Amino acid sequence: MNVIGVVGLPASGKGEFSKIAEGLGIPVVVMGDVIRNAVKKAGLPPTDENLGAMANRLRAERGMDAIAILCVDAVKEQKARLVLIDGIRGDAEVRVFREHFPGFRLIAIETSFEKRLSRLCERKRSDDVGSAEGLLTRDKRELGWGLGNALQLADIRLNNDGSLEEFTARVTDLIHSMEREP
């Protein structure tokens, strides 16, 4: 089994990458689901503030790699040649996946601040921030988890400042090439 991970700042296109992969039949393990489930169990609404606080709590109580460790079994349960992990936020998580999955490769999605802000304002998800200040705050929080270090560890970089069609073509080509690998 080949395992790849996707990393990027908020609204860079990680979720879109995952949708494209799923459309190609690639199983996706979403790290954020661990956090969303913990927020739900706590009886809280899935706002950006609650999700961020829960992620901070899990990392404070169990270590910066806690969420990755909770996802390892879900990845191992997949019966596919290629599996995607969505939502990597730090270098500690990258280390966990490289330890458990030889040949693990990390894909960084790179997108300008302006494009990311525009996307956040358009998609209106419950955990989205709708202002430049809110996005800067979210970026700072995630960079504090080691996201900048994780981005530096990327094996592959994909720019996502263009159209959805351009990004879809790049992701599709990349996934098809990875599916052909032993």
From Swiss-Prot:
Binding-site list for ATP: 8-15
InterPro entries from the UniProt entry: NTP_hydrolase-rel, P-loop_NTPase
Keyword RNA-binding attributed: no
Disulfide feature: none
Keywords for this protein: ATP-binding, Nucleotide-binding
A single GO molecular function term of this UniProt record: ATP binding
Family the UniProt entry places it in: Belongs to the UPF0200 family.
PANTHER family: DEPHOSPHO-COA KINASE (PTHR41930:SF1), UPF0200 PROTEIN MJ1399 (PTHR41930)
Protein name from the UniProt record: UPF0200 protein Mboo_1593
Organism annotation: Methanoregula boonei (strain DSM 21154 / JCM 14090 / 6A8)
